[in-house]
């Protein structure tokens, strides 16, 4: 499964690579990283239909994760990738907006990697 992680905090890449070391080594999961919404859209345009799942932070400078979500769900229709939103703020407003825009799931930081692995394995 190819997963695109979108977060403006670059240390997220190291964290995911450590937490999913076994899955990456076995080829079960492959991660790519974008550090802004704009970079994520460029990646999706260059690798259309490759990312099956997108994990996106909500609060990023420039294009927010919610803006990115809206563009993904309207542009990539056949079928759009699964999008899980990640935020440090688990408030109802962000949750409701994300759901209205088509988010498939919603996680709060700090990410519970055991829970995330379980969710990802159900999609494989």
Placement of each model-derived feature along the sequence:
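Active-site residues of response regulator receiver
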Residues: 7, 57, 87
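A Lys-centered signature of the CheY-like receiver
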Residues: 8, 109
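Receiver (REC) domain active-site loop signature in two-component systems and cognate sites
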Residues: 60
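C-terminal output helix
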Residues: 111-120
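Alpha4 helix (beta4-alpha4-beta5 surface) of REC/receiver domains from two-component response regulators
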Residues: 67, 79, 90-105, 118
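Helix N-cap/capping motif at the beta->alpha junctions
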Residues: 33-42, 65
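Short amphipathic alpha-helix used as the core "switch/output" element in two-component signaling
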Residues: 42, 66-79
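Two-component/phosphorelay signaling modules centered on CheY-like receiver
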Residues: 10-32
């Amino acid at each position: 499964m190819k997963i695109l992680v979108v977060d403006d905090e670059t240390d997220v890449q190291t964290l995911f690579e450590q937490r999913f070391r076994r899955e990456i080594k076995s080829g079960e999961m492959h991660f790519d990283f974008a550090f802004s919404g704009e970079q994520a859209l460029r990646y999706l345009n260059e690798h259309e239909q490759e990312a099956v799942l997108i994990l996106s932070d909500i609060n990023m400078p420039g294009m927010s994760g919610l803006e990115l979500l809206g563009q993904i769900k309207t542009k990539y229709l056949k079928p759009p990738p699964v999008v899980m939103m990640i935020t440090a703020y688990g408030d109802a407003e962000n949750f409701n907006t994300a759901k209205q825009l088509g988010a498939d799931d919603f996680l709060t930081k700090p990410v519970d990697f055991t829970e995330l692995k379980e969710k990802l394995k159900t999609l494989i």
